Regions:
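Extended acidic low-complexity intrinsically disordered regions
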Residues: 1-18
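Short acidic-hydrophobic surface loop/beta-edge motif
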Residues: 18-28
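Short, surface-exposed, charged amphipathic helix/loop patches that serve as local interaction elements
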Residues: 27-114
């Protein structure tokens, strides 16, 4: 196998891994999410962050990454306005923090000073 094939297999395994969840007491539900996402999903979130639209980036990450227990999207793009204007920002921040932290695979010991 080539290095690229190995890299693709590694990422497929991460994408197909078990869903993680965060319990949202205020909403009386659990939000499920994956431990990794392709750049196709991350690109819009990164673009919003680079434009200084941090709140929109948080909401976009929730829209793109929040899943039901069976792995289906919990929210649609049309829910963005409601999430930004009619939902508790503290809850949005907590969910986005959990979902976005899950994709960070760097452990403190992995980074060494030169």
């Amino acid at each position: 196998m080539s290095v690229l094939d190995n890299a693709k297999d590694h990422f497929k395994q991460k994408l197909s891994g078990e869903l993680k969840k965060i319990t949202i007491r205020e909403w009386k539900t659990d939000v499920y999410y994956k431990g990794a996402y392709p750049f196709a999903v991350e690109s819009k979130i990164l673009e919003l962050q680079q434009q200084g639209k941090v709140v929109e980036a948080l909401v976009e990450s929730i829209i793109q990454k929040s899943l039901t227990p069976d792995g289906k999207k919990m929210f649609q793009s049309g829910d963005k306005w409601t999430l930004m204007n009619e939902v508790d920002p503290a809850v949005i921040t907590r969910i986005a923090g959990a979902i976005n932290s899950a994709t960070l695979d760097v452990q403190p010991g992995d980074v060494e000073k030169n």
